[in-house]
């Protein structure tokens, strides 16, 4: 089995799991997985596809600039430049970007703070943080319609081989050293977003919550 086929299957499995959660509204979102380091190549979702379906045209191979590495009629997802920035600056092996109601709400509620902070939740251990009462922070950046501008702003928040950034009203982008790590971190962030949204609703209803 070639490395491209192996990575294709790995990314397809992640896509299927996220699709089962209904995290690909209206063809939104994009996923990628690194194939080679030198030269840098990675598989990324093709633009405009229904990601709830499995087809032979789900992904295409692109180079370090996010351009197709092989002849194809497919176009890479619009945010491929963000993936390229991550791979070019870290040892990440997988990047996942999804739009959910909860992550958009959190990005809107805390945009003025420039970040959202969560603490006191056991799920934080998913990030490898085991301290009692630990807190995690996720930066929130402005959403620029011009993707190169967005990529330049996004690049300021790429620190380490695993991380996450919220784009205001434009979803979350998570990366990890492996597809498993990226998916685990994405699931943990989405848990925290949903918990906070429900917590705020309960507080507004006057119910006693911490």
Curated annotation (Swiss-Prot):
<comment type="function">
    <text>Catalyzes the dehydration of methylthioribulose-1-phosphate (MTRu-1-P) into 2,3-diketo-5-methylthiopentyl-1-phosphate (DK-MTP-1-P).</text>
</comment>
<protein>
    <recommendedName>
        <fullName>Methylthioribulose-1-phosphate dehydratase</fullName>
        <ecNumber>4.2.1.109</ecNumber>
    </recommendedName>
</protein>
<dbReference type="InterPro" id="IPR017714">
    <property type="entry name" value="MethylthioRu-1-P_deHdtase_MtnB"/>
</dbReference>
<keyword id="KW-0479">Metal-binding</keyword>
<keyword id="KW-0028">Amino-acid biosynthesis</keyword>
<comment type="pathway">
    <text>Amino-acid biosynthesis; L-methionine biosynthesis via salvage pathway; L-methionine from S-methyl-5-thio-alpha-D-ribose 1-phosphate: step 2/6.</text>
</comment>
<dbReference type="GO" id="GO:0005737">
    <property type="term" value="C:cytoplasm"/>
</dbReference>
<dbReference type="InterPro" id="IPR001303">
    <property type="entry name" value="Aldolase_II/adducin_N"/>
</dbReference>
<dbReference type="GO" id="GO:0046570">
    <property type="term" value="F:methylthioribulose 1-phosphate dehydratase activity"/>
</dbReference>
<keyword id="KW-0486">Methionine biosynthesis</keyword>
<dbReference type="GO" id="GO:0008270">
    <property type="term" value="F:zinc ion binding"/>
</dbReference>
<keyword id="KW-0862">Zinc</keyword>
<feature type="binding site">
    <location>
        <position position="97"/>
    </location>
    <ligand>
        <name>Zn(2+)</name>
    </ligand>
</feature>
<dbReference type="GO" id="GO:0019509">
    <property type="term" value="P:L-methionine salvage from methylthioadenosine"/>
</dbReference>
<dbReference type="InterPro" id="IPR036409">
    <property type="entry name" value="Aldolase_II/adducin_N_sf"/>
</dbReference>
<comment type="subunit">
    <text>Homotetramer.</text>
</comment>
<feature type="binding site">
    <location>
        <position position="99"/>
    </location>
    <ligand>
        <name>Zn(2+)</name>
    </ligand>
</feature>
<dbReference type="Pfam" id="PF00596">
    <property type="entry name" value="Aldolase_II"/>
</dbReference>
<keyword id="KW-0456">Lyase</keyword>
<comment type="similarity">
    <text>Belongs to the aldolase class II family. MtnB subfamily.</text>
</comment>
């Amino acid at each position: 089995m070639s490395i491209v086929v192996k990575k294709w299957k790995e990314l397809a499995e992640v896509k299927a799991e996220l699709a089962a959660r209904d995290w690909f509204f209206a063809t939104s979102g994009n996923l990628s997985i690194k194939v080679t380091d030198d030269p840098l190549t990675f598989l990324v979702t093709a633009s405009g596809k229904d990601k709830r379906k499995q087809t032979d045209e789900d992904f295409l191979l692109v180079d370090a600039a996010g351009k197709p590495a092989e002849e194809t009629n497919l176009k890479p997802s619009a945010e491929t430049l963000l993936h390229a920035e991550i791979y070019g600056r870290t040892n990440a092996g997988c990047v996942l970007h999804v739009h959910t109601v909860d992550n958009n709400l959190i990005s809107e509620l805390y945009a003025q703070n420039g970040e959202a902070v969560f603490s006191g939740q056991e799920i934080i251990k998913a990030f490898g943080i085991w301290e009692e009462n630990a807190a995690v922070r996720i930066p929130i950046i402005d959403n620029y319609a011009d993707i190169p501008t967005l990529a330049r702003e996004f690049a300021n928040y790429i620190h380490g081989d695993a991380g996450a950034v919220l784009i205001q009203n434009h979803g979350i982008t998570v990366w990890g050293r492996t597809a498993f790590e990226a998916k685990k971190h994405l699931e943990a962030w989405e848990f925290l977003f949903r918990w906070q949204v429900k917590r705020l609703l309960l507080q507004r209803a006057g119910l006693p919550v911490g």
